[in-house]
Every structure is written in structure tokens, then in C-alpha cells.
Amino acid sequence: MPLENQTIDPTAQRAFALNLDDSIYGNFAEIGAGQEVARWFFAVGGAAGTVAKSISAYDMTVSDAIYGKTKRYVSRDRVVQMLDHEYGLMHERLDGLRGDRTRFFVFADTAAAKSFSGGNDCHSWMGMRFQHAVRSKTSDILLHVRLLDTTNARQQDAVGRLGVNLIHAAFHHWKSPRTLIEALLDNIGRDRLEIDWIHVSGPAFKDVDNRLLCLHLVRISYTPALLFDTDGTPLLASESIRRSRVLIERGRFAPVTRLNLEMMARGRIAFESDTSRNTPSRTAPHTADQIATGERGESHDMHDIHEIMEITMNNLRDRGSAEDADFLARVDLLSAVGKMVLVSDIGAFHSLGEYLAERHVEQTGLVLGVPLLRELFNESHYKTLDGGILAAFGRLFSHSVRLYVHPTRDVLDGRIITADTLTVAPHLSHLLEHLRVNGLIRGLICDESTLRTYSSDDVRSRICSGDPAWRELVAPEVAAHIERNGYFGAACPQAPDTRPIMNQP
């Protein structure tokens, strides 16, 4: 039905505006969830001004004949194949006819919507290749989205609206990529779609850092977390850590300290021992010192256990706001010591466990210090959660999660506190003992005579004050990066409260 004869819908308005722009012309290729994006342009009227071609190669054999064989049909590789094929054909057929007055584009998506039998992961890969100016080189936008609606029809509707928003935003907001991202869920909502990965490339985005775009997805609550590889490259968590063992340590890491690395190394030894009974390990044995310093040996397989340092948005805002430069510095330093990074807006540990379970992580180990374990037994954090602390712990440990607790030295009397000697409120002591006896909370072993307790803020304060002793508290690679790039030395605000952060559930 033409736009003038129906109630004005924001998505319809955008599709109609694109149809009226005679400089924009392109192809649509959609697999799965119907042809929901192209449908909007036909429904509002004037589609001849925008749509050169619309195709849906739904049958796998037909799809392979057109785009080539693929291992997975709902994948980034398939979307790129579709963009390559469709844009090549369009350019060959139409460039000579209207290339001097047209900004060509191809939109492609491949989706796995809710099936008749149910039980499948509902998600979509979506891509856009376009000219930001007449005769310009092409630029690409690729994104992954989780479909959160509970019915196939609603998921199709959400995919259609997102596709229209993407095309409209690409042509109208390419100069401001963050504005482009913020426009994607207009008239859809975060309760229906989760955009958990994005990548842009080409001349329209020549100065854009994709790490910062992905951080923005977390900052504006388009996704609860985003994973970065050991070289800082944004990853899709549901692919990168699927069916794997994951060991996570939460902290500020501004900068990452020797103690952080020692905790992770000791946690890995215990986690590997616990989980190898069910998961064959291909990893050669190591000492904590070897792992912490990067001396892993030739037979080490980093894909066996993913070591991830998690920075929550609260920790990233520890000095007021989540500044881009500060974020990049932390990721850079963690990359220097070979760690993956998870930036999350997930406060409660049980919510983190659920996030990882949704990404099909097989087993999870959480490395933490005694102070944070003590905070986990602070019932005030669970006031708004039905079932309180019992519900929180039940949700946490129901997803194959274990806690690995590093000892600490009491700052007042110097005594060593471990997971076994920690005391909590009397009415919670039996809960703590139950978790310890059943191996869900495990104490890590270290040489207590050399145990030092210090934080990232202590190191940062030493850097700011010019105390050279800070170099002893970080790995050599970290010290080299800090000195080379001038991290943390330019601005030295007062350090925040360093007590463990526990967000409300």
C-alpha cells in the first residue's frame, strides 16, 4: 500500500525517503526470514527509484550455485560472498548506464529465524556495500544481530526494520559512525534485537577505529558485552568462545599488574586440572611463572582455554567516564601480554555466567581475590533479586562455573586470608562451606612469604608521582608500552575508592 494511504510508520518513512532519492540505487539479496527488507521499499511505493533487483536464494543448492559453497549459511563469510557477487553484477550491468549520477549499493542478509521445531539460535548477519559519493570506491558495513522475539513473524519484522534503518543510516550518517549505530534500532528497541558486533571499512570510514565502534555498542546498551582478541580485534563471542573453556578475571587493568597475571596463571593451573577430567587437554604443563611471563612452550594451545580479562563499564568509568583513549590503552596493554578482553556492562556475577551460557561456553572459571569473594557474600547486593543471595548463587553455579580465589594479605595486621580461612556472616557460613566442599569455590595456592597485595591504582599513582618502582609491579612488556606511549602519565586525578565493585543484579 502506498505511503500516503497508510498510517505513517517511521520505518516506512525512511524507505519512502530512499525511494524518492534518485541518486541511490541498488540490489537486495536476502536468505532466511523472508525478503523483509526489500518488502518495505515495495510496500511504500516508488520502489523503482531504489530497487534494481531483489533476490532470495532460499534453497541451499540454489544459494551455492549463485554465491559458491560455504560451510555455514548464516555467517559473515556468506554475507561477504553475497555482497561480492551482487555488487559485481550490478556494476557490470548498470555502471555504464547511470554510474555518473548514482550512488550504488547492495544490501545482503542471511538469517536463522525461529524454526517450526524450535531450539535453534535465532540470529542474522547483515551487510551493506555502498558508494558514499558518486564514483567513489565502495565502503562496507557488516553487523551481527541476535533475534530476541519469540515468534518467527516478529523476528522477520525486526530484521526488516533493521535493514531499512541500516540502508538509511549508511547514506545519511556515514560521516558520523556513532550516529549511524545509534540509528539502527530506531522504532525497534533493545528488547527485540541485540547488535553484538559491527565492522566498517572503506573510504567512507577511513579514520574509524572498529574497536571504538564496538565499545559504543556496549556503551549504548545494544549488547551487554563485547569480546576482543589478543591483538585487540573485536570478536563475535558466540563464535569465538563457543563450546570452549573460559577463564575470566575481572578488574580495572589500568594498568594490568604482575599480580593480575599471577592470579590468572595460578587460576589456569587449577581450572585446567578441574576441567581436564571432562575435557581432554592438549596443553603441555606449565608453572604459574611461565604462564604469567609468556614462556608457554611450543606445544601450548591457547585455543584450549581462553584467558579473558573482563573490564566492566563501571571499571572503565572509574575516573568519571569511559574515555576512548583510556579504553584503548587498557586493551593495548592486555594485548601486550596475550590476553583477550571482555568489555561488559554486566554487574552481577550470576548475570555474567548466564551471558557465557547463552554463548554456549562449556565450562567457566572466575578468578578473583578474597576481597571480592567477601563482597559476593554481602546480601545488600541482592535486595532487588527475587530469592536474594540463594537465587544469585543458584543462577551462577548452574552454568558449570567455578570460582578460583587468590589469597590476600590483610592491610591492617599482615595476616594471610584465603578462601578457606575467610569468614562471612554466621548465617551464611554454611553456604560458603557447602560451595567449598563441593569444589565450586577453590582456593589458589601461592608462596605466602612473597605475597604482595597491590592494585592497578597503586601502580598508576606511582607512575603519576614519578616513582620508578612501578616498573617492578608490571610485566616488562607492559612497562615498555606504558613508557613508549606515555600511558597514565599525562593526567593524574585522585585515585578512586579501590574497594571491590559489585553492581546491583
What are these language model-derived features?
Residues 2-505:
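Nucleotidyltransferase catalytic core that binds NTPs
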